[in-house]
C-alpha cells in the first residue's frame, strides 16, 4: 500500500494540535482526521479515534506494524514541512 496523497489543514487555535490530515492510499482508500500533535518529544501523529465510555479512546483505523506507521508518519511530516516552508516564505515576502 502506497501513500498517494496527503492533505493537511492547519489548526489556527493555540494548543498542541497543529493540523488535521487526510491520507489517500493507492488512489483508492482515504483515512481522514489524522492529527499532528506537538508533544514533549516533538511532533507525532494520532490516528482517528472514537470516545468509548468513560474517557477512553479507541483508534478507528491504525497501522498494524511499525514499518507501515513509519512510512505514514514520514509522508505526513514531509508534506507538513513543505507546507510550513511555503507559509514561511510567503510571510517573508
Curated annotation (Swiss-Prot):
InterPro entries, A to Z: SpoVG, SpoVG_sf
Keyword field: Cell cycle, Cell division, Septation
Disulfide links within the chain: none
UniProt key word Ion transport: no
Pfam families reported for this sequence: SpoVG
UniProt-listed GO biological process terms: division septum assembly; sporulation resulting in formation of a cellular spore
Family, per entry: Belongs to the SpoVG family.
Function text: Could be involved in septation.
Entries under HAMAP family matching the protein: SpoVG
Protein name: Putative septation protein SpoVG
Organism of derivation: Alkaliphilus oremlandii (strain OhILAs)
Gene: spoVG
